[in-house]
From Swiss-Prot:
Belongs to the DnaA family. Residues 73-102 are annotated as: Domain II. This is Chromosomal replication initiator protein DnaA. One of its GO terms (cellular component) is cytoplasm. Residues 1-73 are annotated as: Domain I, interacts with DnaA modulators. GO terms for molecular function: ATP binding; ATP hydrolysis activity; DNA replication origin binding; lipid binding. ATP binds at G147, G149, K150, T151. InterPro entries: AAA+_ATPase, Chromosome_initiator_DnaA, Chromosome_initiator_DnaA-like, Chromosome_initiator_DnaA_CS, DnaA_C, DnaA_dom, DnaA_N_dom, DnaA_N_sf. The lineage of its organism: Bacteria, Bacillati, Mycoplasmatota, Mollicutes, Acholeplasmatales. GO terms for biological process: DNA replication initiation; regulation of DNA replication. Keywords: ATP-binding, Cytoplasm, DNA replication, DNA-binding, Lipid-binding, Nucleotide-binding. Residues 324-445 are annotated as: Domain IV, binds dsDNA.
Length: 445
């Protein structure tokens, strides 16, 4: 990773703490790493003009403050849209790939992946793909919410293949890095597509993480489409991850999404409590902390972080580090001391109090004069579906919890159903003033 990319990753860590999850995921996480460093000016790429203007207007001062804090030399950042970058000349940069390591994290293996009901099918199919790359499921498309193990499972495929065939050429690449490589090579000389294609085509297995980041990057999508077809026709294994099903991807060209759907799609769901406890036990063992963490404490931590395994493991690491630093036995009092700030922030930004969900459901039901059971239930008459969709939308808007979690509040509806409902309400509000008035009125209650 380049020094500029490292700087941005460090800034990202602070931005995640400073702003709510929705702002972080929508504005900052998809930003492509810098492609130019000129006299201390780092240029960052975002998907479109709207995101560029929003960041430059509302957040650039804080971002540059953090850049100054973490950089050893004077530096400032500016944000440009994807289309601006294509037209702006930059210095040449050779694209190099280390196939021996494939950009893989060696700790992401099948053995270290904790299997449960929520990821069993995805795990078993991943192992089949690793055993027979290019032959069983191609492309292999893994989707699910943030922090549930998609990257781990994807890289486990790569590590397994490398362990069993050192001659295999494997590449793991995040979608934003793919965009950065494309932009850097083509911004001066648009005829360099041959060099770009040659580097990426010379592989046996490609692992592309967070494909949704390519949204709106039309030129990059076209190049990826060409690469996809070449690899597929030559029986090279393609593995892709995303935060949503291929059919729900927005601003990704249909010719790509239909190809994603033509392979095998598997989802990783939110793990049940027992599964989360098992994950924590495995993590505790790998930390080799020589500290006993009781079942009750593991259960408490698991119950507080239902939707994001990465956050849950981070909380455990923080707890153990705190106990080691002050030479403490891990008790509930120590848990409160070590994780108090984390849990308080989590409650503030992502309140998981079910009664508050009930309150939104009740207010919406009263407004539309339908019963709560009908609002939550499966009746499909418009009298019930509209308020049901609005209730889903408002819960997502206020608490920003995973779509799967919202679905569990409405008779166990699935991720895609809730996502579709929320997008429909948001879309229809732009065209229907009566609907917007109704939603605004409910919000004021």
């Amino acid at each position: 990773m380049s020094p500029n990319s490292t700087l941005w990753q460090t800034i990202l860590q602070d931005l995640e703490k400073l702003y709510n999850e929705e702002t972080y995921n929508e504005l900052f996480l998809p930003v492509t790493s810098t492609f130019k460093d000129q006299n201390g000016l780092l240029t960052m790429v975002v998907a479109n003009e709207f995101l560029k203007n929003r960041i430059n207007k509302l957040y650039i001062a804080k971002i540059n403050e953090l850049a100054t804090k973490y950089s050893s030399t004077p530096v400032r950042l500016k944000f440009v849209s994807q289309e601006e970058v294509i037209e702006e000349p930059v210095a040449d940069r050779k694209l190099t790939i280390d196939y021996r390591q494939g950009n893989l994290n060696s700790t992401y293996t099948f053995d270290s992946f904790v299997v449960g009901k929520s990821n069993m099918f995805a795990f078993r199919m991943a192992m089949k793909v690793a055993d027979h790359p290019g032959a069983v499921a191609n492309p292999f498309y893994i989707f699910g919410d943030v922090g549930l193990g998609k990257t781990h499972l994807m890289q486990a495929i790569g590590n397994y293949i490398l362990d069993n065939d050192v001659e295999k050429r494997i590449l793991y690449v995040k979608a934003d890095n793919f965009i950065e490589d494309f932009v850097s090579l083509l911004s001066r000389n648009k005829n360099k597509t041959e060099e770009f294609n040659a580097k990426y085509k010379d592989i046996d297995v490609i692992l592309v993480d967070d494909i949704q980041i390519m949204a709106n990057a039309s030129k990059t999508q076209m190049e990826f489409f060409k690469l996809f077809d070449y690899l597929y026709l030559n029986n090279k294994q393609i593995v892709i991850t995303s935060d949503k099903p291929a059919s729900q991807l927005t601003n990704i060209m249909p010719r790509l999404t239909t190809r994603f759907e033509a392979g095998l799609s598997v989802d990783i769901q939110i793990p049940e409590l027992e599964h989360r406890i098992s994950i924590l036990k495995r993590k505790t063992a790998t930390l080799d902390a020589n500290l006993e963490v009781s079942e009750d404490i593991l259960t408490f931590i698991a119950s507080q972080f239902a939707a994001n395994i990465r956050e849950m493991e981070g909380a455990l690491i923080r707890l153990i580090s705190y106990a080691q630093t002050f030479n403490l036995e891990i008790t509930m009092n120590v848990v409160e001391e070590a994780l108090g700030a984390v849990l308080k922030t989590k409650k503030k930004t992502n309140d998981l109090n079910e009664n508050n969900y009930d309150k939104i459901q009740s207010i919406v039901a009263d407004y539309f004069q339908v019963s709560l059971p009908d609002l939550i239930g499966k009746k499909r008459h418009a009298k019930f579906t509209l308020p049901r969709h609005i209730a889903m939308y408002l819960i997502k808007l206020k608490y920003n919890i995973p779509y799967k979690t919202i679905g569990s509040l409405f008779n166990d509806r699935d991720h895609s159903t809730v996502l579709s409902a929320c997008e429909k309400v948001e879309r229809d509000m732009r065209m229907d003033s009566n609907l917007k008035f109704a939603v605004d009125s409910i919000v004021k209650k």
